[in-house]
């Protein structure tokens, strides 16, 4: 097993010669998330940290790896963390760029901002990573004991000064010394194996641990695998497989443990090393299958092709590494006709799929050879002796041939006793009810049942699909399986790909287990294999195995499956070895539902679409492509091929025979000259060995590209639609002859001749739908259709890969039936699409148009290959198609652009640049697609094409409803859309002067969901946003089928979003701004982002819409109703509150039980009324935000924003976009929130110009971006720069905004005003009051420029004039309940009384907090337990009676404090603190390090030192920005209060008075933190912890109960330091006012500011700025709910006077002057007198 036999070597050596034409380059060092397992994964999977020996090994290997990457690009961008330190399958250390998230501050060296990445910086990060890995323990008592050497090394590596850190050489030397007896490589290999071994589902590559993990307990069936040892390949097909011994689990548990302890047994090493690797074949599910495949040549060829296809993309588009690898793993194909023959003779990829390929997809001799090979060469393997193969035909080699001889759709009935297909008609009616077990086998044995009438098993579905399930498909499958599982009374013990059945409507149900009782141990839970009771969680385990197999389908086994973390975590949890650790079905359903709900997806629709895409084709008459991306593009009318022009081929007759002609085909003039000629691509020498794609009708393509999986079309309805389409065949035929001479190189809607009649070559060879991607070295095909005069036509339409039938085919590339296709053999592997132009489409979301169902060329339904769209709608855009042709002719090489999506998107983008100057045109293209070389001649040709004679007529803006249903549409607009209502308003690209090539909404869907799902995307790319046009186009329904994405979750958000966008655009001077004068989204927008407004708000607004009788959905129409209801609720609240106050006074006098009962009821009513008022205020805020969202642009239109100032008066300018205007996005799985749809990608980074332009993006207000920007923009631009940017946009669009209210100019103008108003409202005190020049400039601009043309801007000018007063008023209003005066009058007693008379203590319940482990804090009174507020804090009491009655203090000195109650002092101190806090702004807490604020109380800057900062202090703001230093005033005040507290105590002349004051301050502090005044509480704690106070003898006589408060204060301080958002958790911060500690909040923000703000390309990390904005937004959150205590001016004056008196005093000197601060030494009775005399004598001598 260790070495490959000579025959095998010879086979691979010979096979390798066929691959020599490839230019091999070294693979990327770090294919991120592909083969690597990170240290974080290892730690979390095995649930313990590294041992000391492992730490030495990892340190050594990392140091060596670090030295090897010193000159690599990753060295400058790497930050070593547990997530970026990874191990590949060989155990080698790898570094991965974790671009999707900022590293934690603990791993970033302190000097990083100044020095960047250096060896010293990486050593610091490595030390921090190792420290974290060593301390990763689930329980405190398991903390490791480290040796002195290791502890010292880690400490040195994490030294603050880089010069004190050891160098690499010394680290390596020390590690090698410590690793003398062991091999560090072996230990790291063991760690790598652990990361893969812990999860049995994921441990495909670790064969030695085959049965020692989760799957342990059931031996593999003896006859599952071949019985012979590897031998001569020419005589023994089993030589392709490992021996049977590998399949057997260890004989005993001891053997299992021994195998588990070995790092990795040597025997499977050859399986993991090239060229013999674990290539997994389609349809294989079991671990045994995976071992059988270990020496499969097909797997190796696929993997080599895979790596070649991944190579170019990984290097050219590093931002899409993750997508590239994931996509390319789905692109398995064969190379070369010779190789294909050899492969087919040695090992079938999948018998079921192979039969289809042999019959319909590949040549006939393949089927014959494979059918003949296995039964003859392996007679010993009988069907009745292969129980393990009952569901996996490929498991037994002998079975494959017999399977091919049986029913083509089902395989052998004997071989598969209980197949999966079920009658689809019944399943439609049954819904989610599982079919009875008796009926399934009976129906499935009907050989005549077709795919359209049966359900499919997952194995059939995957085989026909030819690729693994994508992420959202896995979520849908998981939800459907679990939902079906809940309906079962008896939980199935065994689920696999064969008995998980998918009905036509997407319903999943479970078939019976194998009739012979054979189970694959992969799909058995450990407890089931041990013959324990089958529980629900055992079935959950089976579902996880099924999902993992579906996700791993056709992925090479030595590649780590790249799944998103959220999905992977769920699968791992579901596959836990112990049932108790697995989630229940309900819990897993909740996770799946939240994911799908966020994206507006429906699981049944997704699965129904998948099933429809594979089941509508009759296998006998329709061909299925090889695998994944080379799927079928349905044969549209006059479909043309997309071949190379190697030897030229011309069709000489109307059949499919092709005749070669010597040399290139003579070319005719270009198609744009309206002549019938052959495109130059077929005749150009430059296109030899290049796939040529003729662009299809973009009007149809656009709809299908954006086809949503969750479309509301039912499959059966779609079938009816197909039939209706089929009836138009004759009309299409007539249209062909009428249009073919007029439309050159564009689509002629008519049936395809080859598709109209079945032809024998198409059945035995490769028919039209077999594969579209031409082989790089294969012959070119040119098909001429009868009656078209040689005009080649591209496919009429095509679908995104996952939406196309039988796989994913590239756009516009269809190889017509003919023997040549079969002789081509292999196809070039699919390359991942370009990062900027396109990515593998995988979105289930759709465009605004009608979503067409995928329709293969099903000759039974539609003998003419189903014309996809009606004949009158087939007008194409010649300019766009010619542009695509030029692009492909230039760049389609080595498989690039094989699938046509790249060319389509690039062509549409370029087409959008029409009407620009040539220089601007060239600059925009070069910047957008900067990774390609654009020849000047090519740019000239493209410029000529897009600005050709046909352009002006197409560039005119279409008015709503101007386009008839059957009139020819522009190339970019869906021809399926019968109406274009609202097009100009909601699709800004259509008003780009050029008319825009596409619907921006659809383009947005494509860009975000289907074309750029890579990890990173640079440039202005579209994101998924609420598509408001979907429900505005009910006439887009065809046959009663509604438009896409109207499920329960998306419906609410779409409805609400629709309110914000008028149907007719509204007048230019829309009065909405005057009705909704508050444009600021508020702190909640920055903090909660998309979750700011919950589903209740959406539903309420939707109800408002339904109540409108006049049909208006304008915001202005909603406002009066809402305002009226809000006013009524406020009035009721005030009346009830006044009645409550009267009853309260009566209760005080009478103390009657009846009054008390009524008071209790009234309290509940008041709470309910207050909640209602707050809710209505939130709805009002939402409508205000949606007014701003009304003017949002799709991100694809954002380049207009960047250089709009230079645009001519009638067009929008696409000036060259350089690095200064880029944005970077990344994919995330956002956590479930309010149910609102969220974006698939969020902004990761951007340059200042790009970030400012992104303010104009749709949903920028709703998603919180605007508010976060307003908090943080000073890090990258000054207020003057920002104002200049806004005013430029306003001035550039002002004159044009009033010409067309629906234009993009209007949207830019209105959004600019909204952003400007939000800025003024939110940051007036920060940016405008202190900067008179900025304020004057804005006022002058509004007065002189805006007001003469737009009177609605008057409110903005008024806002500037009363800015200060308005800001102060809004801050003092509690929850916006009423007018300020009424609020002060009414809410104050309500809040106070509710707090005082709350018997259940709701308002006094303390926040949840804890002491973090290992913080070193020792609590003397509560060592044995962890602090909680409930346990640490007794019931609140103010001790009013304990300290005597209230007395007016007139004398000075500490005695006056004892004359006031604790509550009086607490309330007045709170009001004093609140007065200061209300004046601060979140921006004041930013960049505090530059102000000298340090993480020590002693370092709080004094008044004298605050102005002179250290030279080392470097500001994070721009140098010319003058920062407001109000934070220093807050901190100085806090320091003064602490000093006052300490001074009052140490200046008390008696111990008794000191005890009284200590008690007083402790009880005040206790009241403070109970009432959430953490600022004063921490200030008092600071005073009490002063050294002079702590040394006071009064502590010794302080009552124990009072002394405990000190420990509680310390615990609260620890809690406040633990989490930057701890005060925002729970309901208390909403119900009660809060005053945070300014110093601690500044420290939290400082911690977030640690690390680099900019990336290597100069872009600012928006993810970091977003987190800072969230923390800073707490300031405004707490200011919204102020305390309503009654002020006591006299007491406040006394407190201010005492605090000012001790401000800046030295407490130690004050303490030294007071003898009460010294401990009395016991002695003789005269000792005190002697001491007094000595003191007096000393005074006389001085």
UniProtKB/Swiss-Prot annotation:
Changing residue 461 to A: Abolishes interaction with MAP2. Residues 215-288, 365-455, 703-727, 744-876, 948-1006, 1028-1076 are annotated as: Disordered. It is found in: Cell projection, Dendrite; Perikaryon. Changing residue 477 to A: Abolishes interaction with MAP2. Disulfide bonds: none annotated. Keywords: Cell projection, Coiled coil, Guanine-nucleotide releasing factor, Phosphoprotein, Repeat. Residues 755-771, 949-965 have a biased composition (Low complexity). Residues 403-412, 782-791, 1043-1053 have a biased composition (Polar residues). Residues 1239-1367 form the N-terminal Ras-GEF domain. InterPro entries: Kinase-like_dom_sf (IPR011009), KIND_dom (IPR011019), KNDC1 (IPR029899), Ras-like_Gua-exchang_fac_N (IPR000651), Ras_GEF_dom_sf (IPR023578), RASGEF_cat_dom (IPR001895), RASGEF_cat_dom_sf (IPR036964). Highly expressed in the brain and at low levels in the ovary. In the brain it is most prominently expressed in the cerebellum where it is restricted to the granular Purkinje cell layer. RAS-Guanine nucleotide exchange factor (GEF) that controls the negative regulation of neuronal dendrite growth by mediating a signaling pathway linking RAS and MAP2. May be involved in cellular senescence. This is Kinase non-catalytic C-lobe domain-containing protein 1. It comes from Mus musculus. The gene is Kndc1.
């Amino acid at each position: 097993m260790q070495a490959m036999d000579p025959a095998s070597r010879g086979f691979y050596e010979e096979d390798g010669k066929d691959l020599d034409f490839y230019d091999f380059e070294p693979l990327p060092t770090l294919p991120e998330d592909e083969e690597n397992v990170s240290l974080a994964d290892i730690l979390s999977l095995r649930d313990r940290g590294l041992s000391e020996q492992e730490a030495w090994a990892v340190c050594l290997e990392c140091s060596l790896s670090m030295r090897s990457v010193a000159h690599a690009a990753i060295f400058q961008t790497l930050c070593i963390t547990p997530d970026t330190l990874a191990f590949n399958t060989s155990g080698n250390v790898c570094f991965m760029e974790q671009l999707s998230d900022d590293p934690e501050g603990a791993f970033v060296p302190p000097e990083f901002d100044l020095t960047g990445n250096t060896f010293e910086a990486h050593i610091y990060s490595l030390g921090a990573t190792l420290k974290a890995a060593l301390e990763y323990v689930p329980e405190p008592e398991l903390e490791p004991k480290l040796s002195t050497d290791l502890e010292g090394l880690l400490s040195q590596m994490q030294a603050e000064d880089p010069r004190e850190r050891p160098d690499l050489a010394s680290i390596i030397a020390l590690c090698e010394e410590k690793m003398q007896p062991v091999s560090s490589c072996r230990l790291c290999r063991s760690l790598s194996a652990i990361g893969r071994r812990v999860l049995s589902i994921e441990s495909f590559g670790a064969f030695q641990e085959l049965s020692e993990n989760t799957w342990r307990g059931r031996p593999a069936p003896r006859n599952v695998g071949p019985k012979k040892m590897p031998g001569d390949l020419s005589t023994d097909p089993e030589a392709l497989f490992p021996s049977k011994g590998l399949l057997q689990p260890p004989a005993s548990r001891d053997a299992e443990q021994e195998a588990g302890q070995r790092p990795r047994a040597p025997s499977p090493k050859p399986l993991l090393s090239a060229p013999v690797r674990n290539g997994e074949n389609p349809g294989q599910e079991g671990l045994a299958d995976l071992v059988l495949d270990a020496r499969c040549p097909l797997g190796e060829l696929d993997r080599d092709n895979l790596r070649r296809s991944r190579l170019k993309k990984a290097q050219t588009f590093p931002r899409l590494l993750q997508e590239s690898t994931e996509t390319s793993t789905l692109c398995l194909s064969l190379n070369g006709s010779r190789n294909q023959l050899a492969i087919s003779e040695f090992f079938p990829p999948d018998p079921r799929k192979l039969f289809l390929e042999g019959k319909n997809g590949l040549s006939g001799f393949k089927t014959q050879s494979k059918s003949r090979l296995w039964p003859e060469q392996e007679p010993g393997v009988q069907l009745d002796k292969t129980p393990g193969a009952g569901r996996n035909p490929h498991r037994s080699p002998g079975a494959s041939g017999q399977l091919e001889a049986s029913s083509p759709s089902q395989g052998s009935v004997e071989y598969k006793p209980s197949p999966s297909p079920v009658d689809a008609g019944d399943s439609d009616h049954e819904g989610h009810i599982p079919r009875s077990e008796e009926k399934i086998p009976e129906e499935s044995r009907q050989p005549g049942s077709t795919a359209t009438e049966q359900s499919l098993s997952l194995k059939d579905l995957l085989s026909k699909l030819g690729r693994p399930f994508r992420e959202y498909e896995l979520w849908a499958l998981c939800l459907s399986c679990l939902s079906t599982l809940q309906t079962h009374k008896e939980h199935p013990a065994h689920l696999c790909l064969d008995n998980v059945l998918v009905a036509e409507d997407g319903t999943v149900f479970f078939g019976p287990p194998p009739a012979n009782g054979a189970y694959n141990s992969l799909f058995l839970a450990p407890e089931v294999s041990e013959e324990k009771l089958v529980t629900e969680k055992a079935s959950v385990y089976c579902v996880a195995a099924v999902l993992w197999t579906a996700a791993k389908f056709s992925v090479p086994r030595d590649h780590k499956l790249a799944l998103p973390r959220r999905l992977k975590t769920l699968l791992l949890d579901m596959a836990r070895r112990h049932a108790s650790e697995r989630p229940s079905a309900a819990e897993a359903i909740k996770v799946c539902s939240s994911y799908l709900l966020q994206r507006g997806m429906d699981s049944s629709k997704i699965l129904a679409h998948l099933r429809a895409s594979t089941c509508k084709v009759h296998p006998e008459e329709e061909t299925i492509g090889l695998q994944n991306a080379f799927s079928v593009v349905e044969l549209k009318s006059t479909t043309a091929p997309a071949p190379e022009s190697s030897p030229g081929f011309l069709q000489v007759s109307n059949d499919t025979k092709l005749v070669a002609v010597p040399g290139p085909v003579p070319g005719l003039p270009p198609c744009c000259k309206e002549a019938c000629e052959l495109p130059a691509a077929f005749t150009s020498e430059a296109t030899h060995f290049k796939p040529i794609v003729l662009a299809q009708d973009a009007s149809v393509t656009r709809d299908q590209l954006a086809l949503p999986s969750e479309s509301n079309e039912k499959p059966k309805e779609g079938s009816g639609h197909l039939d209706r389409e089929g009836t138009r065949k004759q009309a299409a035929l007539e249209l062909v002859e009428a249009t073919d001479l007029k439309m050159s190189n564009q689509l002629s809607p008519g049936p395809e001749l080859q598709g109209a009649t079945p032809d024998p070559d198409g059945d035995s060879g490769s028919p039209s739908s077999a594969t579209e991607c031409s082989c790089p070295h294969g012959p070119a095909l040119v098909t001429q259709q009868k009656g078209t005069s040689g005009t080649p036509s591209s496919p009429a339409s095509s679908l995104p890969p996952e939406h196309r039938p039988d796989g994913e085919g590239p756009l516009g590339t269809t190889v017509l039936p003919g023997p040549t296709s079969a002789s081509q053999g292999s196809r070039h592997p699919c390359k991942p699409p370009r990062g900027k132009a396109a990515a593998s489409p995988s979105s289930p979301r759709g465009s605004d148009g009608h979503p067409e169902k995928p329709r293969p060329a099903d000759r039974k339904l539609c003998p003419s290959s189903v014309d996809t769209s009606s004949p009158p709608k087939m007008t194409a855009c010649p300019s766009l198609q010619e542009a695509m042709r030029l692009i492909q002719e230039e760049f389609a090489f080595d498989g690039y652009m094989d699938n046509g999506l790249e060319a389509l998107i690039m062509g549409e983008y370029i087409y959008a640049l029409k009407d620009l100057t040539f220089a601007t045109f060239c600059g925009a293209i070069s910047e957008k697609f900067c990774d390609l070389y654009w020849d000047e001649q090519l740019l000239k040709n493209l410029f000529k094409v897009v600005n050709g004679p046909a352009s002006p007529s197409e560039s005119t803006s279409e008015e709503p409803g101007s386009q008839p249903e059957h009139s020819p549409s522009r190339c970019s607009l869906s021809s399926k859309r019968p109406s274009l209502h609202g097009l100009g308003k909601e699709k800004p690209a259509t008003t780009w002067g050029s008319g825009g090539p596409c619907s921006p909404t659809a383009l947005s869907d494509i860009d975000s969901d289907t074309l750029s799902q890579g990890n990173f995307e640079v440039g202005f790319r579209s994101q998924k946003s609420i598509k408001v046009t979907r429900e505005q186009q009910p006439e887009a329904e065809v046959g009663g089928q509604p438009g896409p994405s109207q499920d329960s979750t998306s419906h609410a958000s779409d409805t609400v979003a629709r309110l914000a966008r008028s149907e007719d655009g509204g007048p230019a001077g829309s009065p909405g701004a005057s009705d909704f004068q508050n444009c600021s989204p508020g702190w909640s927008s920055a903090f909660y982002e998309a979750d700011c407004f919950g589903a209740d708000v959406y539903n309420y607004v939707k109800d408002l819409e339904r109540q409108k009788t006049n049909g208006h959905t304008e915001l202005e129409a909603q406002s009066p109703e809402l305002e009226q209801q809000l006013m009524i609720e406020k009035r009721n609240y005030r009346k009830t509150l006044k009645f409550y106050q009267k009853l309260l006074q009566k209760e005080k006098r009478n103390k009657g039980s009846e009054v008390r009962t009524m008071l209790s009821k009234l309290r509940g009513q008041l709470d309910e009324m207050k909640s209602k008022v707050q809710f209505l205020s939130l709805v009002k805020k939402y409508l205000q935000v949606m007014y701003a969202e009304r003017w949002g642009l799709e991100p694809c239109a954002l380049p207009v924003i960047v250089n709009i100032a230079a645009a001519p008066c009638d067009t929008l300018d696409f000036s060259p976009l350089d690095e200064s205007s880029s944005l970077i996005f990344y994919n995330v799985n956002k956590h479930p929130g309010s149910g609102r749809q969220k974006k698939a990608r969020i902004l990761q980074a951007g340059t200042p110009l790009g970030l400012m332009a992104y303010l104009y993006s749709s949903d920028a207000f709703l998603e919180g971006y605007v508010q976060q920007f307003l908090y943080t923009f000073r890090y990258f631009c000054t207020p003057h720069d920002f104002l200049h940017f806004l005013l430029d946009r306003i001035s550039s669009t002002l004159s044009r905004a009033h010409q067309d209210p629906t234009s993009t100019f209007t949207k830019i103008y209105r959004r600019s005003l909204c952003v400007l108003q939000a800025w003024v409202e939110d940051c007036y005190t920060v940016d405008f009051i202190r900067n008179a020049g900025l304020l004057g400039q804005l006022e002058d601009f509004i007065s002189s420029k805006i007001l003469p043309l737009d009177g609605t801007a008057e409110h903005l000018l008024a806002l500037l004039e009363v800015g200060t007063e308005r800001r102060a008023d809004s801050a003092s209003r509690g929850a916006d309940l009423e007018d300020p005066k009424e609020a002060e009058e009414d809410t104050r007693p309500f809040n106070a009384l509710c707090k005082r008379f709350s018997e259940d203590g709701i308002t006094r319940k303390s926040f949840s907090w804890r002491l973090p482990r290992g913080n070193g804090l020792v609590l003397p009174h509560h060592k044995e337990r962890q602090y909680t507020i409930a346990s640490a804090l007794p019931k609140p009491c103010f001790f009013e009676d304990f300290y005597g009655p209230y007395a007016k203090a007139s004398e000075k000195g500490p005695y006056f404090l004892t004359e006031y109650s604790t509550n009086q002092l607490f309330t007045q101190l709170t009001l004093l603190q609140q007065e200061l806090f209300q004046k601060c702004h979140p921006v004041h807490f930013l960049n505090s390090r530059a102000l000298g604020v340090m993480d020590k109380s002693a370092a709080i800057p004094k008044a004298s030192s605050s102005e002179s900062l250290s030279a080392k202090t470097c500001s994070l703001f721009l140098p010319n920005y003058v920062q407001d230093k109000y934070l220093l005033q807050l901190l100085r005040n806090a320091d003064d209060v602490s000093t006052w507290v300490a001074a009052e105590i140490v200046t008390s002349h008696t111990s008794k008075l000191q005890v009284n004051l200590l008690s007083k301050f402790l009880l005040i502090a206790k009241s403070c933190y109970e009432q959430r005044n953490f600022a004063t509480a921490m200030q008092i704690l600071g005073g009490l912890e002063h050294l002079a106070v702590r040394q006071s003898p009064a502590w010794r006589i302080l009552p124990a109960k009072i002394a405990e408060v000190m420990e509680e204060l310390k615990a609260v301080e620890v809690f406040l330091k633990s989490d930057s958002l701890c005060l925002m958790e729970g309901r208390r911060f909403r119900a009660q006012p809060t005053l945070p500690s300014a110093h601690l909040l500044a420290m939290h923000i400082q911690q977030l500011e640690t690390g680099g703000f900019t990336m290597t390309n100069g872009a600012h990390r928006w993810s970091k700025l977003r987190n800072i904005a969230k923390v800073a937004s707490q300031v405004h959150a707490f200011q919204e709910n102020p305390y309503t205590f009654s002020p006591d001016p006299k007491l406040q004056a006394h407190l201010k006077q005492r605090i000012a008196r001790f401000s800046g005093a030295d407490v130690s000197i004050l303490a030294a002057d007071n003898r009460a601060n010294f401990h009395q030494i016991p002695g003789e009775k005269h000792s005190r007198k002697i001491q007094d005399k000595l003191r007096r004598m000393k005074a006389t001598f001085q």
